[in-house]
Amino acid sequence: MSVSAFNRRWAAVILEALTRHGVRHVCIAPGSRSTPLTLAAAENPAFIHHTHFDERGLGHLALGLAKVSQQPVAVIVTSGTAVANLYSALIEAGLTGEKLILLTADRPPELIDCGANQAIRQAGMFASHPSQTLSLPRPTQDIPARWLVSTIDNALAMLHAGALHINCPFAEPLYGDMNDTGLVWQQRLGDWWQDEKPWLREARRLESDKQRDWFFWRQKRGVVVAGRMSAEEGKKVAQWAQTLGWPLIGDVLSQTGQPLPCADLWLGNAKAVTELQQAQIVVQLGSSLTGKRLLQWQATCEPEEYWVIDNIEGRLDPAHHRGRRLVAKIADWLELHPAEKRKPWCVEIPRLAELAWQRVVAQRDTFGEAQLAHRIRDYLPEQGQLFVGNSLVVRLIDALSQLPAGYPVYSNRGASGIDGLLSTAAGVQRASAKSTLAIVGDLSALYDLNALALLRQVSAPFVLIVVNNNGGQIFSLLPTPQSKRERFYLMPQNVHFDHAAAMFNLRYHRPENWEELESALAGAWRTPATTVIELVVNDTDGAQTLQQLLAQVSHL
């Protein structure tokens, strides 16, 4: 019997089973113990293959692919710390709902806890963060193939959102020519190999329940809060709220067009908060809210009912309001709960939103970080997409810009870490094949610098704007101790990114004014390649401008 040949047949069943559940993208890191899985994926024509030498970046690449494709994405890594490097992407997927299938190769049980090389306790290492876990046995013909395929099918059928971790131990030898070992074992699956359906088909009901008292609540004074959702859902939510006459507070990721722009500015005005206190119901569609003032208002508002609608299960209201948690796709829920045409009940908030917008526009000519956030809608590629980093940049765009309704916006706002942002953006571009604008800070770019290797392979123009404010300037917005701020919070690195771009043979520009930036962008959008644009800005201007605008708008 050939161990290596049967390992490959076992792995081939696993990978083929994944194709029956919509898996098309497979992300592969180099490794020896994962050879059976890698070869099975490489030989399966149903897959699009992606490779990367860094498992942490690989996991985030898969995350980006899943965000756009809305299908599960498989990741293959070898044993040991390679597995641990998937942790941050797995956590993010658990919070934002993308489906990742983590296929982690492992040593067989007899090599665990005995000093064997590259052998760690992988089973259960991700604790409660995966949505599903599956620890497979060592490949053996004593276990029928139908058990293996039905086990994979069951795990995937139960995966509603987040990650499925499948730990796959393989004994040596891992290499060798294929022979007839295990062929009969494999053939017992019959015509399943030619079919396109799962071996085990499990129906899942995910239908929205209609709230029978909706006709009553839609006649009340309501507020709509729009969090993360798809571009199509964003347009529908905006129209729904407009018909109801309810004010819509749209997050940067809502894609609603933010009809009341600069919400994180005007929510700092007491007149706005007073008017919102008249709301009898708040309907929040989507989660992962960004704005600090929005979160503060959400935490203190006390409507009669607070509804949260999202297709991700679990509690999504950190303020723990009395109300309803409804698990449903946003578009489906809107269809079941039509709006009734009513006059807008808010008067003060539209006025404040307009005045806040005017204050922001008045500062747009200065070359700086806050002004870039405001201008970002002018730089979006036509029929393209935007990827927004974390920390200060996403807050500035949320507070100071007004993105077009229905324009695709992506980000990692689940755990909101700065790890893997460039890798995620690379996955977003690969899955969509669209022109992409990504914007991150300098520390975020440094944190995922080797992901520039992934950006050498793009199918449409990709522009990475690195806002270099020399450190983590978001801490300038927080009451960090002044004497300790620079060394222990901001951590300025005093670096530029021209050499990094050159290392990976990427185009590079460092504009010093708006005209130079617009010229660099015009050239970049004509070229199906990656262009790194570094904006070197004054360290504290972005945070200070936001604070100044907050003070101005609060006194309107």
Swiss-Prot record:
GO BP annotation list: menaquinone biosynthetic process
- The enzyme's main class, written as a single word, is transferase
The membrane spanning regions, by residue number, are none
Q: In which pathway does it act?
A: Quinol/quinone metabolism; 1,4-dihydroxy-2-naphthoate biosynthesis; 1,4-dihydroxy-2-naphthoate from chorismate: step 2/7; Quinol/quinone metabolism; menaquinone biosynthesis
Any Pfam family matching the protein: TPP_enzyme_M_2
Q: Which SUPFAM superfamilies does this UniProt record tie to the protein?
A: Thiamin diphosphate-binding fold (THDP-binding)
One of the entry's Gene Ontology molecular-function terms is: magnesium ion binding
EC no.? Answer: 2.2.1.9
The chemistry this enzyme catalyses reads: isochorismate + 2-oxoglutarate + H(+) = 5-enolpyruvoyl-6-hydroxy-2-succinyl-cyclohex-3-ene-1-carboxylate + CO2
Q: Which cofactor does it need?
A: Mg(2+); Mn(2+); thiamine diphosphate
Keywords linked to the UniProt accession: Magnesium, Manganese, Menaquinone biosynthesis, Metal-binding, Thiamine pyrophosphate, Transferase
Instruction: Give the co-factor note.
Output: Binds 1 thiamine pyrophosphate per subunit.
Note the NCBIfam families from the entry: menD (TIGR00173)
What job does this protein perform?
Catalyzes the thiamine diphosphate-dependent decarboxylation of 2-oxoglutarate and the subsequent addition of the resulting succinic semialdehyde-thiamine pyrophosphate anion to isochorismate to yield 2-succinyl-5-enolpyruvyl-6-hydroxy-3-cyclohexene-1-carboxylate (SEPHCHC).
Q: Which family does it belong to?
A: Belongs to the TPP enzyme family. MenD subfamily.
Report quaternary structure and partners. Homodimer.
Q: What is this protein called?
A: 2-succinyl-5-enolpyruvyl-6-hydroxy-3-cyclohexene-1-carboxylate synthase
